Swiss-Prot record:
Keyword Metal-binding: yes
Top EC class for this record: hydrolase
Residue sites binding a divalent metal cation 1 per the record: A158, E178, E219
Binding site for Zn(2+): C98, C101, C116, C119
InterPro entries: NAD-cap_RNA_hydrolase_NudC (IPR050241), NudC-like_C (IPR049734), NUDIX_hydrolase-like_dom_sf (IPR015797), NUDIX_hydrolase_CS (IPR020084), NUDIX_hydrolase_dom (IPR000086), RNA_Hydrolase_NudC (IPR022925), Znr_NADH_PPase (IPR015376)
Cited function: mRNA decapping enzyme that specifically removes the nicotinamide adenine dinucleotide (NAD) cap from a subset of mRNAs by hydrolyzing the diphosphate linkage to produce nicotinamide mononucleotide (NMN) and 5' monophosphate mRNA. The NAD-cap is present at the 5'-end of some mRNAs and stabilizes RNA against 5'-processing. Has preference for mRNAs with a 5'-end purine. Catalyzes the hydrolysis of a broad range of dinucleotide pyrophosphates.
Gene: nudC
Protein name, entry field: NAD-capped RNA hydrolase NudC
Keyword Heme: no
Subunit and interaction comment: Homodimer.
Annotated a divalent metal cation 2 binding sites: E174
Source domain of life: Bacteria
Amino acid sequence: MELQLTGKESGWWIVSHENKLWLPKGELPQGNAANWSLQGTTARQIGEWQGQSVWLIRQMMPSGMGSVRQLLDVDRGLFQLAGRGVQLAEFYRSHRFCGYCGHEMHASRTEWASLCNHCRERYYPQIAPCVIVAIRRGDEILLAQHVRHRGGINTVLAGFVEVGETLEQAVSREVLEESNIHIKNLRYVTSQPWPFPHSLMMAFMADYDSGELCHDPKELLNAGWYRYDQLPLLPPPGTVARRLIEDTVVLCREHSDLSQ
C-alpha cells in the first residue's frame, strides 16, 4: 500500500525511474526520510533488510541516478531488493494504461500487479527466464566473449528460454547454437534474479560430450577452452556466472590432480 511520507519514516530508500537507481554518494540511501528530503513523496514498502523497511519511490532525482550494478559487490540480499525495486518501478511506469481497453490502471494493494477497473484485466511484472551453463572438458572450462559485453570479459554461455521449452532443452539448444558442441551430465546449481532488465538466471553445470568448437559470430566474439589455472578476465564476484566458473575450477583442479 502506498503512503505519503511525513519524513519520520526510516529504512532503505529505493528511488527509481526508467531502470535507473538513486545512489547519492554512490550508495543506497538509508535512514529517516527527512534526512534525504523525501517527505511529501509517495512510497511503498517492498520488503525488509537487516530489520529495516525497504521503500520504493517512483521518481527521477535531479542528480545521483545510477545503475543497480553498482550494488553488485555490496551484498547479494541488498542487490536483489534493489533489483526488485527497479523492476517494479519500471513495471508500474509502463503499465499506467490497460493494453486491452486503454483505461487507466491502478496498483494492487495485495500483490505486485496493476489492475484495470474497466475490463478487470490484471497485469504482473514480466520475468524473462534465462539459462546459463558452465561446461567442463577435463581440466578445461569453456569461456566466451559475448558481443554485448565490454572490457574483454570472458564468461560462460547463456541465453533465453524459448516458448514451449524445458530448461534442459534450452541449455542444450543454446550451447549447440553458440558453440557447435553437445553436452552431457547436465545438473542444476542455483538461480539469481538479474534486473537487466527483468531476467531470472537459472544456472547449470555440464560436461563436454562431442563436437568441434565453433562459435557463432552473431553472438560471440570468440570462444575457447581454458585450463583452470590460465583463465582470462572473468565476470565480477556476486554474479552467478562467476560462481559457476569458480565451482567448475574446483572440478577441473580435482581432475588434474587425479590425472597426475
